[in-house]
Each structure stands twice: as structure tokens, then as C-alpha cells.
């Protein structure tokens, strides 16, 4: 089986599926693009096409928080109530670190009452939602539960501590330093994104149709960044050479002894003694994967503007390739 076929096994659902793929391993490079930025246009996807990163965005939020920590403006142990005094009292037990590694137990904003006709929620709406809560799912720090709410709150903390908008902060303190000059933080209805891919779904006849937004796709902290293959290649090279990365890649043991392989915006696993760092993204009409390994001299980036694709499968396909099980 060829490498492309192995990596994309159970990932490509139709010949018209839009995607951009980059794979590098020890001098071998595979690059491939397919499809249109929108089913409504004739514009082809390229390596400069900007896709919504979905949860891959969390790396950039975490990186920004680590910046502020290294500048001694906050610490990993800063409790959230000391930043937002109008949040419920239980936030005095939740730290920056708990938000970063998903051990806070705060409620999922996706469980808010809503209808498809409601306006899209913004990050500030999630802060207001948290003010109405009175408990967590579990005792803080005792379990891992992936939390989009936590990363929205982290994005708001970046704004509050830096006294800059999240888009201004990331574009000046992360994107520019990494050379990612075409990447954007999307403020819905405001930001103009060049070369933008729009999300799609498949109908019952397996035909593409545009489905790019829904009620919770306008938030920033949990998934509102846009980038391309070419810019994400720059990000990988930049990230691994920063002191922030040392903090971000570290996994944790939580208080019940369970191993938490989620660091700070990055998941870390070990394959045959080699560390692999990655994050997947999943939102309406779009799925993403950013994966790299210093040990293996490897990088894999996959962006598709077709929803309903589990990019964890591609990560598992890669592991099979590494283990020689093909």
C-alpha cells in the first residue's frame, strides 16, 4: 500500500472532497491538494488555502497563555476568581493549569439551551453562562474532561491580562513571530480571510453542500483560528524551538493517579519509544489534524473542508505506518 493510501484510509469519503495534506518524514515529502474552497465556486484548494482549524486552535491559545506566564503576568497556579471576581466562588479552586489541561470540570457551553434560530454565541456569552453555574462535573483536578469552555475562558484571560484583543495578541505575538503572515483569528462578521475554505457536509446522495456555520462556530478560544498548510509548516518549525514547547508537551498525572496525555494544547503519545505530539480539530463542515515528532523527524498536517471526518483515524493510520503494520 502506498503511503498516501495508508494515511487517508477511511478518511476520504468522495472524490470531490476538499483537502490539503502535507507529510514529511526523514527527507521524504508528500504533498497533495484536492477539491474546491467552496462547492459554489471554481476556486481550487491550494497549500495557501486557509481552513478553520477548529480545536487545533487551542495550541495557539495555550502558547499565548504560556507567554504571559513567562512574562510573570500570571502563573499556572493563578486561580480564576482572582482574574474574574464576578464568577462563582468555586472558581477560586480552579487554576490556569486546570483550564489548560482539561482538569477543571467546568460545564460545557454546548449544553446551553439554544435553537438553530438563535444568534451565534460569542466568547463573552460563555463567560456570562459560567456566571450562572454553581458547580463542576467533578472535584477540580481529579479527572480529565475535554473542555471547549475552558479554552474560551483562556482566550478571554489572554485579552484581560494583555489588554489586547485576542486577534491582536495572537497575530502580533504568535503568528508574526512564526512567519504565519496569512493566518487569522476569525471575528465572525469582521475578519476578512483571504483564500478561505468553506465547510461542507454530504447529503444522502453523497453530494457536497456548503455548511460552514452553526450556533457555536463563532467562538474564538476553542477553535476560531484559520491557517493553511504553508503557514502551519512554519508553526511546527517555530514551536519546537521555543521554551514554551517544553511546558506545552508535558503530560500530567491527575490526582487519582490516572495518566493524562494532554499537555497544554497538545496531546503527547509514545510509539515504539518515540514521542508524537498532535491535536485534532472537529467543527461543522471542517476537520483538521496537526501532528509532529522530533524523535522521528516527522510532520503530518491534514485539513479538509468536509465535516464528519474523524482525523484520529489518520493519526492511527500513521501509527500503523510507523510500526510497519502495512
Regions found by a protein language model. Give the residues of each.
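Short beta-strand scaffold segments in enzyme catalytic cores
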Residues: 19-23, 267, 290
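Active-site SXXK
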Residues: 5, 27, 52-77, 154-159, ...
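Short, well-ordered beta-strand elements
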Residues: 30, 278-279, 288-306
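Structural recognition of the beta-strand scaffold that forms the well-ordered cores
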Residues: 20-22, 98-100, 299-303
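Short, conserved catalytic-motif segment at the N-terminal edge
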Residues: 2-51, 73-75, 132
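Short, gly/Ser/Thr-rich active-site loops of penicillin-recognizing serine hydrolases
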Residues: 272, 307-326
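Short, surface-exposed loop or secondary-structure junction motifs
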Residues: 91-282
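Short, glycine/proline-biased beta-turn/loop segments that scaffold the active-site neighborhood
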Residues: 75-90
Amino acid at each position: 500500500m502506498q503511503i498516501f493510501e495508508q494515511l487517508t484510509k477511511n478518511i476520504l469519503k468522495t472524490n470531490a472532497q476538499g483537502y490539503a495534506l502535507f507529510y514529511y518524514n526523514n527527507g521524504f515529502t508528500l504533498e497533495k491538494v484536492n477539491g474546491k474552497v467552496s462547492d459554489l465556486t471554481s476556486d481550487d484548494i491550494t497549500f495557501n488555502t486557509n481552513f478553520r482549524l477548529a480545536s487545533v486552535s487551542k495550541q495557539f491559545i495555550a502558547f499565548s497563555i504560556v507567554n504571559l506566564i513567562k512574562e510573570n503576568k500570571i502563573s499556572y497556579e493563578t486561580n480564576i476568581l482572582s482574574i474574574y471576581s464576578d464568577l462563582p466562588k468555586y472558581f477560586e479552586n480552579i487554576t490556569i493549569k486546570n483550564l489548560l489541561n482539561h482538569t477543571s470540570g467546568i460545564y460545557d457551553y454546548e449544553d446551553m439551551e439554544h435553537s438553530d434560530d438563535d444568534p451565534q454565541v460569542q466568547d463573552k456569552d460563555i463567560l456570562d453562562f459560567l456566571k450562572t453555574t454553581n458547580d463542576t462535573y467533578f472535584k477540580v483536578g481529579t479527572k480529565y474532561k475535554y473542555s471547549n469552555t475552558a479554552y474560551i475562558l483562556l482566550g478571554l484571560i489572554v485579552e484581560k491580562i494583555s489588554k489586547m484583543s485576542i486577534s491582536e495578541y495572537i497575530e502580533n505575538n504568535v503568528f508574526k513571530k512564526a512567519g504565519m503572515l496569512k493566518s487569522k483569528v476569525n471575528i465572525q462578521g469582521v475578519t476578512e480571510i483571504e483564500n478561505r475554505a468553506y465547510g461542507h457536509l454530504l447529503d444522502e446522495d453523497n453530494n457536497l453542500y456548503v455548511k460552514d456555520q452553526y450556533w457555536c462556530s463563532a467562538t474564538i478560544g476553542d477553535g476560531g483560528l484559520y491557517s493553511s498548510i504553508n503557514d502551519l509548516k512554519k508553526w511546527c518549525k517555530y514551536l519546537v524551538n521555543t521554551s514554551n514547547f517544553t511546558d506545552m508537551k508535558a503530560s500530567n498525572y491527575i490526582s487519582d493517579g490516572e495518566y493524562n496525555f494532554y499537555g497544554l494544547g497538545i496531546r503527547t503519545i509514545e510509539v515504539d519509544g518515540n514521542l508524537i505530539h498532535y491535536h485534532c480539530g472537529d467543527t461543522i463542515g471542517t476537520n483538521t489534524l496537526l501532528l509532529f515528532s522530533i524523535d522521528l523527524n516527522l510532520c503530518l498536517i491534514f485539513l479538509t473542508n468536509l465535516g464528519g471526518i474523524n482525523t484520529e483515524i489518520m493519526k492511527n493510520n500513521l501509527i500503523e505506518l510507523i510500526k510497519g503494520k502495512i
